[in-house]
A protein has these predicted regions:
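Arg/Lys-rich, positively charged N-terminal/basic patches that mediate binding to nucleic acids
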Residues: 1-35
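Non-catalytic, surface-exposed connector residues within folded enzymatic/regulatory domains
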Residues: 4, 25, 49-52, 88
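Generic alpha-helical scaffold signal
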Residues: 29-32, 52, 68-72
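Conserved phosphate-interacting/catalytic interface
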Residues: 38
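A short, surface-exposed loop/turn module that caps and links secondary-structure elements
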Residues: 43-66
Length: 99
């Protein structure tokens, strides 16, 4: 599935592995695994098939956002967007949900 980055820091992490030291090693590994799964997905429904991702829609003020759990503490947040070429995933951030 197509994706783009809202966050410059996450984009740099993905393409150049810059800023990796800011996160636990298991979070970095899970981030790259999640990105591989996103890239391989044909559409958004494919992400729901992988129960290990815990792909879910957020609620409240973040009702348009979704998340993938990287571990019990960290999540990759994203949003489904549309353009002339169809749906794509906008990667928002890697967030610590305990803070």
């Amino acid at each position: 599935m197509r994706f783009d980055f809202h966050s410059r820091k996450v984009k740099l992490l993905y393409f150049e592995e810059k800023g990796a030291r800011k996160y636990p090693a298991e979070v970095i590994d899970a981030f790259f695994d999640a990105m591989s799964t996103i890239k391989a997905a044909q559409d958004i429904r494919d992400l729901y098939k992988f129960k290990s991702l815990h792909f879910e829609k957020l609620s409240g003020a973040r009702q348009n956002d979704r998340s993938i759990r990287l571990n019990k503490q960290w999540r990759l947040t994203l949003r489904i967007e549309k353009d002339d070429n169809g749906d794509f995933i906008l990667i928002l951030d890697i967030e610590d949900y305990h803070h």
